[in-house]
C-alpha cells in the first residue's frame, strides 16, 4: 500500500511540474536582483550615439488620458515596468511613491502595468494610496520594444529621448535615489 501511495504521489508531482511548463506565459519573470546598465556613458565613451527610447502610447489609469512617451520630453522620465502579480515590483512601489513626491517637479514619473488588463492595477494603485502616474498600453508591443524579460525594469530617459540608464530588479529607496540621480 505504501509503494502504491508513493508511486501515486510521484506521478502527481510529475504531472504538476510538466503541466506547469505547458501553461501559456508572457515570458516576463519577476527579478529580485537589480542589474544596473548605464547606457549613455558607455555609448559616449565608444563614440556611439545613445539609444533612443522606443516610443509608445499609454493610457493613464486614473484620468483615462492617452499619452505618447515622446510627449514627456519637457523633463527627464523615470519609466518603470511592473505588475501586481510581481512581489519585487510591489515591494518597490512605496519607494517610487516617496521619490515621486520628492521629484515630481523635476522628473516625469510613468509606471506602466504589464498585468495584461487594466482592472488589476486600477484597483490596486488607489487601494494603496499611490498617486504617481500609472498607465497601461499594448503589453506585448511595449515588452518587445524594450526587450523586457524580467520586471521590475526601470529606465531613465533624457529630455533628448535617449535612454540614460536602465536597471532590472527591485530597488530599495537608497538604490532608487541613486538611480534617479542619473536623470540630472
Regions found by a protein language model. Name each.
Residues 1-55:
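N-terminal targeting signals for export/organelle localization
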Residues 55-77:
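A short beta-strand-turn-helix
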Residues 73, 81-101:
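Conserved redox-active cysteine motifs that mediate thiol-disulfide chemistry
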Residues 73-75, 105, 130-131, 148:
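Active-site acidic short loop of glycosyltransferases
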Residues 78-79, 109:
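Hydrophobic beta-strand anchors of alpha/beta hydrolase catalytic cores
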Residues 91, 98, 120-127:
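Short alpha-helix adjacent to the SAM-binding motif of class I
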Residues 105-119, 130-139:
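Thiol-based oxidoreductase modules, predominantly thioredoxin-like and allied folds used
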Residues 123-131, 137-184:
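Thiol/disulfide oxidoreductase modules built on the thioredoxin-like
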